[in-house]
UniProtKB/Swiss-Prot annotation:
Keywords: DNA damage, DNA recombination, DNA repair. GO terms for cellular component: bacterial nucleoid. It comes from Granulibacter bethesdensis (strain ATCC BAA-1260 / CGDNIH1). This is DNA repair protein RecO. One of its GO terms (biological process) is double-strand break repair. The keyword Lipoprotein does not apply. Involved in DNA repair and RecF pathway recombination. It holds the Pfam family RecO_N. NCBIfam families: reco. InterPro entries: ARFGAP/RecO, DNA_rep/recomb_RecO_N, NA-bd_OB-fold, RecO, RecO_C. PANTHER family: DNA REPAIR PROTEIN RECO. The keyword DNA-binding does not apply. Belongs to the RecO family.
Length: 250
């Protein structure tokens, strides 16, 4: 049994003196794990950094075995993100959420396709990568069967003025209909409605992370009796701190 495909490295844990157990994500194969011989060595360790795009080859004698992984580096996203704490936080969050949420050996191409481009753009910096990461989490929720319905208001059916989401149903709510339940609803940032130019700021990023994080926590990680990954919570905390800094200097 074997396959070869472009993959994103999601994790690599030391195993023995020089080997590691790696998790990779590809378009056609989904999330796969395997043993990497010499994966922590000086020569190969840089390849297996979470976030890197690699051309990976998985082999095993039987389909249900752990198997072995080898790879060649395509794009060193991990190294390029090191110079910017926010970019690094985004990268770590993406990798840990993907590994924790995706089922093993099950293809989810819609969740994979945006990731290589997103990871490549990390080196460019800017808040766009945060928005892209939140959009990707919304795609992941949809792929796993928990998609948000942001097309029209759940109460009135109107398609404009959508500024909130019901935490119970995951459906959008307009400002007019939201008034009686404002303290219970989740803010809906405009960039999730394809209006990126209107609110590219830390407050919108915080609201977006809170929104997708709520449903990831309840519907994906919660059903497995696990919390959101620490790297995902750390990204939210970093963005929340940015909003406080901006408020103090306003």
């Amino acid at each position: 049994m074997e396959w070869t495909a472009p993959c994103i490295v999601l994790s690599a844990q030391p195993y023995g003196e020089a080997d590691c157990l790696a998790a990779v994500f590809s378009e056609d194969q989904g999330l796969y794990r395997g043993l990497v011989r010499g994966g922590t060595s000086r020569q190969r360790g840089g390849i297996w950094q979470p976030g890197n795009l690699v051309m990976a080859r998985w082999t095993a004698r039987l389909a249900d075995q752990l198997g072995s992984l080898t790879a060649e580096l395509i794009h060193p996203a991990a190294a390029l993100a090191m110079d910017d704490p926010l970019n690094l936080a985004v990268l770590r969050s993406l990798c840990t959420v993907a590994e924790g949420a995706l089922p093993d050996r099950e293809a989810h191409p819609a969740a994979f396709i945006p990731l290589p481009g997103l990871l490549t753009r990390l080196s460019l910096g800017g808040g766009q990568v945060v928005e892209d990461a939140i959009r990707w989490e919304a795609i992941l929720l949809r792929e796993l069967g928990y998609g948000l319905d942001l097309q029209r208001c759940a109460v009135t059916g109107q398609v404009s003025g959508l500024h909130y989401v019901s935490p119970r149903t995951g459906r959008a709510v307009s400002s007019d209909a939201a008034e009686p339940w404002l303290d219970r609803l989740l803010p809906l940032p405009a960039f999730l409605l394809h209006q990126a130019e209107t609110d590219s700021d830390p407050v919108a990023w915080r609201d977006g992370l809170r929104l997708t994080g709520y449903f990831l926590s309840r519907d994906v990680f919660g059903t497995r009796h696990r919390p959101l990954p620490p790297a995902r919570m750390s990204l939210y905390d970093r963005i929340a701190a940015l909003t406080e800094t901006e408020r103090e200097h306003a």
